[in-house]
């Protein structure tokens, strides 16, 4: 009886106690106030949570699949180098996966290749697959090739990124970028209470050259596409070409195009002119370091000598198609009839290029002071009918050059232009010498003439510095695409290669540390204050965009993580393939289990010796390397990089919670006082 009396509580006190507990539970659910005592042994926050992940994963909507471009890792993006990473194969069906956000691409590609019989090499894009919507330069390649396969795959196991769809194959006439797909926690978009932008479909470009979405198309002609003897010609117009023998950047090609126009070096006859650039010229001049971070450089072009051969109009077309022109493409693949965009009619020496709504004026290539001619040794050149004829040959000596300056300065509200004034051109008269050329002329001599029929004989001598990867992948062509890929992956994880890991990283410091992403905008959502320093709220209302800045190369680490994960998955693929073969072998053994003529191996012969390789250690080493690089690595303090907004806004949730607790306690005391 005494014990029962102790356990019983007065009815009024029980009501007050229950009300107090319900109030605590309610505020705990609202403000996430912990009910227990938290100390160091029960709560541990990692460096990533403290320093980087200010935007926590509050919902699964923030977890986005993002397409990361391979060019962010510093891979070669020129057309001769990029095409060596692709190969044809039959018997493998294409795979397509979707992704939600993509990275802005500096270089994209568009292929229209035909077989010698006129049939198409690449399949048409299925319904729903559109071109990659954010490309600074679109390299459009037309031509012919053997195309030994049904589909064109990536030899390194990467995807071809289209508009929110990643495919394992290349589609005809559809712009794509090379990349991989990774998952990121993107900051949650803030509500815009002043305007609500409707949901719009992505567009490839705009007609406004000052827009950050402006895209430029550069056109090429290719013969022997997909082979080691592929020849590429940069198209200036339908009769003027430039032979690509080294790693030409898009900016150099644009400046070269401007120089050819303004100096009057285009073909003014019915024959084709094929230019050959002096191999001593630095073709990397004007290279851009991705979208936002430009290289401030001043280069002086050395005196150069260009030679060309006038090709008769009776000669065979280079690619079997009517050539197109280089043009600025505002979303369509139409060609231009003149050079109004690439070089204005008044021969202006200024090429306007744009990035993210900010202009950068690039002063054009050179000022021609004198153009001299020199006679060539008399040789003969066979014509189309096996006869010899004279060909006018010009040796152009550009003896004076001006500095080329690319100067890009960021401002908070407006675009900037280069301080270099426009250069002027003065082209002198050209004098022709009636000479003959020989088919066996050495093409390395810039003073001699070249022709499209024989310029591939020594083209490899001038660009050996960027053909290593392509020749390695093509050295074992009989093994097939997947075998080559697996062999390359296996080579990446050997002990000797890992010992040189730091040296490789230091030798290739071209990783893009910034992730400039685009994604389809949600209904009624717009950009918040987090992105105002770079783009302003909801630029054009088309994309939710941002620039993620992280210390210590976190984005570079993410790129490397995605690549290493891909390599590990390739090993899993090989292990699965071998296990499948082993299963077939076991099936055969079971089929002959009742046969007693020497056993299974005697019946199956050499097939009995197949044994699946154990790749567990290699995969484990790769995972350990990822853990060492991205988990155990300490991060620097980011306190110095916090501005006033990101510095105090992180205390808002804590302030709201403390204020709520104080209000709850005051309300509780008032209620208790009123009850009593």
UniProtKB/Swiss-Prot annotation:
Stretches for region Mucin-like region: 305-485
Extracellular side, ranges: 33-650
Keyword Lyase found: no
Stretches the record annotates as Receptor-binding: 54-201
Presence of the UniProt keyword Nucleotide-binding in the record: no
Similarity annotation: Belongs to the filoviruses glycoprotein family.
Misc remark: Filoviruses entry requires functional lipid rafts at the host cell surface.
Protein name (database record): Envelope glycoprotein
Organism of provenance: Zaire ebolavirus (strain Kikwit-95)
Taxonomic path: Viruses, Riboviria, Orthornavirae, Negarnaviricota, Haploviricotina
């Amino acid at each position: 009886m005494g014990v029962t009396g102790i356990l019983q509580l007065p009815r009024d006190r029980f009501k007050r106690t229950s009300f107090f507990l319900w109030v605590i539970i309610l505020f705990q659910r609202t403000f996430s106030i912990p009910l227990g005592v938290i100390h160091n042994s029960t709560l541990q926050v990692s460096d990533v949570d403290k320093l980087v992940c200010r935007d926590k994963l509050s919902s699964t909507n923030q977890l986005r699949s993002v397409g990361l471009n391979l060019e962010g890792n510093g891979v070669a993006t020129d057309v001769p180098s990029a095409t060596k990473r692709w190969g044809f194969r039959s018997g493998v069906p294409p795979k397509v996966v979707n992704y939600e956000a993509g990275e802005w691409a500096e270089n994209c590609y568009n292929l229209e290749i035909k077989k010698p019989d006129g049939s198409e090499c690449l399949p048409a894009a299925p319904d729903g697959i559109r071109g990659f919507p954010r490309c600074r330069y679109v390299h459009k390649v037309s031509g012919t090739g053997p195309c030994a396969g049904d589909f064109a795959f990536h030899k390194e196991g990467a995807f071809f990124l289209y508009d929110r769809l990643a495919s394992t194959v290349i589609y005809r006439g559809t712009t794509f970028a090379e990349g991989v797909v990774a998952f990121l926690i993107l900051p949650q978009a803030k509500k815009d209470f002043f305007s609500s932008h409707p949901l719009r479909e992505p567009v490839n470009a705009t007609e406004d050259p000052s827009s950050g979405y402006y895209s430029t198309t550069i056109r090429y002609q290719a013969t022997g596409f997909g082979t080691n003897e592929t020849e590429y010609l940069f198209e200036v117009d339908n009769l003027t070409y430039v032979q690509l023998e080294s790693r030409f950047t898009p900016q150099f090609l644009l400046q070269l195009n401007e120089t050819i126009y303004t100096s009057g070096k285009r073909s003014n006859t019915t024959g084709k002119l094929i230019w050959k650039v002096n191999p001593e010229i630095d073709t990397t001049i004007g290279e851009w370091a991705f979208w936002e971070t430009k290289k401030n450089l001043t280069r002086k072009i050395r005196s150069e000598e260009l030679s060309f051969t006038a090709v008769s109009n009776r000669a065979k077309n280079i690619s079997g198609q009517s050539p197109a022109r280089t043009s600025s493409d505002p979303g369509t693949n139409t060609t231009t009839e003149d050079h109004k965009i690439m070089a204005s009619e008044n021969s202006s020496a200024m090429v306007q290029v744009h990035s993210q709504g900010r202009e950068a004026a690039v002063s054009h290539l050179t000022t021609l002071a004198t153009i001299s001619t020199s006679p060539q040794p008399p040789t003969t050149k066979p014509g189309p009918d096996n006869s010899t004829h004279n060909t006018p040959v010009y040796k152009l000596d550009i003896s004076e050059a001006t500095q080329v300056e690319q100067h890009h300065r960021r401002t908070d509200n407006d675009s900037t232009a280069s301080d270099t004034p426009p250069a002027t051109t003065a082209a002198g008269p050209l004098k022709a010498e009636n000479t003959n050329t020989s088919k066996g002329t050495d093409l390395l001599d810039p003073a001699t003439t070249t022709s499209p029929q024989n310029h591939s004989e020594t083209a490899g001598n001038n660009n050996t510095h960027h053909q290593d990867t392509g020749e390695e992948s093509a050295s074992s062509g009989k093994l097939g695409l997947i075998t080559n890929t697996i062999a390359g992956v296996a080579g990446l994880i050997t002990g000797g290669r890992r010992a040189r890991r730091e040296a490789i990283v230091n030798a290739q410091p071209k990783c893009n540390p910034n992730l400039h992403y685009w994604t389809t905008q949600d209904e009624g959502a717009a950009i918040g204050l987090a992105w105002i320093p770079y783009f302003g709220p909801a630029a054009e209302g088309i994309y939710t965009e941002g620039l993620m800045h992280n210390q210590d190369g976190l984005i570079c680490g993410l790129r490397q993580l995605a690549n290493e994960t891909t390599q590990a998955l390739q090993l899993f693929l090989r292990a699965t393939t071998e296990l499948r073969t082993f299963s077939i072998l076991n099936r055969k053994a079971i089929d002959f289990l009742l046969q007693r003529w020497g056993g299974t191996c005697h019946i199956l012969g050499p097939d009995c010796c197949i044994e699946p390789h154990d790749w567990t250690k290699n995969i484990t080493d790769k995972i350990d390397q990822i853990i060492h690089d991205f988990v155990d690595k300490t991060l620097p303090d980011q306190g110095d990089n916090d501005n006033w907004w990101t510095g105090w806004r992180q205390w808002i949730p804590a302030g709201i919670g403390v204020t709520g607790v104080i209000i709850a306690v005051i309300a509780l005391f008032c209620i208790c006082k009123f009850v009593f």
